[in-house]
Amino acid sequence: MSESRKLGEQERLLNYLHGFGGLIAMSVLHIRGRLDPSLLQQGLDWLQEQHPILRSHITYGGLVFRSVPPFVYRQPSFVIEGTGRIPLRVVNDPDPEAWRQVLATDLRTPIKRGKLPRLRVTLVRQSANSDLHHVVVCADHATLDAQSGNMLSRHLMEFLADPAAARARQPIHASLPPPLEDGLPRKPDSGKRPYQPAIRLPNRPLPRPKMETRVIARRLEADDADRLRSAIKTNRTTLHGAVTSAFLLAVRRRYGLDEMTVLTTIDLRRLMKPALHPETYGCYIDILRTKNPIGGDLWGTAKDVSFRLISTLARDQQSASILKLFDWEVYRKELGGIVSHRRRIDGLAVTTAGESGLRRDYGPFELADVTMAVSLDMFGPSLFIIGSEREGGIDLSVGYSASAISEEEVTALADDAFTQLGGRTG
């Protein structure tokens, strides 16, 4: 660990994509209570003390040459010295839905280069006397994954509830933790898995296309979520398998497809040697593509999804990973589909972030809801589903680009999947 280090291979790729508006990571905390902007800024300052990545900026050094696009780039590095505070902007707008426009704008606006952290925050409220506040967090995906996003939200809420207790907490890391590649064993590759091209959702009429990432949110409350967890245990599968299966079956009913590729985010902290502390802040993921037949019922499909993902991770992680620069084979097989399908790189992506640790009550504040999203305008899957557990319930955020698929299509797919999982759409 040190006061500076080069970005790892995946951090470098994600930072590069961020500069073009790709995979910008967002979350929104919907908070009830009289939240003073100065207290929120104190919380952001404290987060920087706790997490070295948050008190670092990125510099760009010598040239690196490659045989595939981009053929040349400057080597990026995290540097702690000289980094400024996390910027906080306050928006007062009488429109109760103004936070959605802030979210949409941030999702297509990369964080500028310079000596600021790779995170920015906007506090959206109707007025200075409002009881409901929306804390919109925008991050460079090179510095944050879903687990880190939940941790940031949890730590910030804990500070707001009791600043003195939070300040007494010792940081997990005193300086920058290592990149993924430094501690990860070589990715398994049997050599028997050819490149798997994406299977995309069919194009449907799009009467009002708009370059804007949007989110449809659904929540399974605790009683419905408990029934789902019991069924998952009985059927020997996972929450990821169940959520993916529900959306696959919804796709089959709506489009008549009998197979589909799925992008799945995998947390790799525990696979590193030595294993990273579970509260290490940063981006420690891979994204794997698997091809899944769509047949049978919810639970049969869920078990098949889980089996294919586990076997791919164990045997063919290297070839199944999409978190790497495209080579010429990928360009040959994917460029036409990306162009003809409104810049979609796949049909579905599913991330299940596990238990967030977030609760409703935080001293004088109440966490009313949480929204999570990833920018999909420049490119991405048709649907990006993020599942996270909170206070016994399960939150589902279904992201999509309004330039690629209509709200009516996404709502129909989300409601179908949600109903299969035991949710109540009425």
What is the role of each PLM region?
Residues 1-15, 22, 91-93, 143-230, ...:
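Non-catalytic, low-complexity flexible loops and terminal extensions
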Residues 31-52, 137-154, 218-256, 396, ...:
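Acyl activation and transfer enzymes in specialized metabolism, enriched
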Residues 69-88:
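Structured interaction and signal-relay segments at domain junctions
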Residues 156, 160-164, 251, 309, ...:
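Short, well-ordered alpha-helical segments in soluble proteins
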Residues 43, 132-133, 213, 228, ...:
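Alpha-helical hydrophobic/aromatic positions enriched in membrane-embedded helices and signal peptides
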Residues 1-67, 72, 96-119, 252-426:
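Acyl-thioester-dependent acyl-group transfer interface
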Residues 30-34, 91-162, 166, 175-183, ...:
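Histidine-centered acyl-transfer/condensation active-site motif
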